Structures are given as C-alpha cells and as structure tokens.
Amino acid sequence: DPLTVAHATRMLLKDLRSFAHPRWTQTGFRRAHGSEAQGTTMRNLFGQVDGTVNAQSGTDDFDELVWAREGWIAGGTSMVVRRIHMDLDRWDRLDRSGREQAVGRTLANGAPLTGVNERDEPDSAATTPIGFPVIPEFSHLRRARSDDRTQRIVRRGRRGPPATSRAAST
C-alpha cells in the first residue's frame, strides 16, 4: 500500500533527522500483501518470475545466508543495494524464445527450460539435438546459481517504475 509506505518513510526520516540525512531515495514496489497466493514468486518488469531459488524465511538455509555468526556483525546482517537498468524497449523487441533463452526459464510459469514446473531442478548438462546447451551459459538462471555456498545471497528485488521512452509515448 503506497500510503502506508509513504507514512512509514516519513516517520523514519523524521526520527532520524538528528542522526542522518538521506543521500538519495529510490521508489520501488512489490505486489500488495494478499494479492497473490502464499508462496507465489513475484514477476519482474520483464514478466519473468524472479527469486525462485531464494532461501525462504524461517528456514535453516535462510538463517545461514542472512545472519552473521562471528566478528563485529555477529547476530546481525548486511545489505547491498544494487540498481539495475532494465531496457524494456529492447526486451520488447525479443521474441518469446529469445526472452526464455536470456533467462533460462519459460515465460508461462518460470520452469527451467529443462523442466515442467517453476521449482524443478534445472539440468545444466542437457543439450539440443545439435549439441547446444538447452539452458544457455549466458542465461540468468546459470549465472545466478552457484554450487559454491560462499557465493549465495538472498535477493529481495523491488521494482521501480520504468523510465518513459520515446517508443512508449508514440
């Protein structure tokens, strides 16, 4: 609810006035609570499911990834904000196959290109009849997954309004 978020933001900023001041702000949004069934993976502005393999809150996997166990941050966590430009006009020019190849998942339900359902384990060794990987090595799915536990993170994507372009206004 944008009204609730605006009020909470104002209260936080008001209470921090004597300690800090904002350097920049970023508007973002997710689906409103209750607008989708529990456990539904959100979609990004490209229309792709986003965050399928994130560790789920309340699990040992989540706790291991999020909560520091030692050092100055023991019992705490950290956060990185990364702003990613999404070129929606260029994305619109890709056909369905190109979009699915770029992400490594189907548009319809987010299943890996080697699976049927969103949470199916992708088969990285599967190849096409002419020997190309079914899930391309450049795909988001391959690049975002790692077997090295030290490279795993929990992502909490927020969507911002897309920039208006000439293509969108004509």
Q: How should these model regions be labeled?
A:
Residues 1-170:
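Long, histidine/aromatic-enriched segments associated with O2/redox biology
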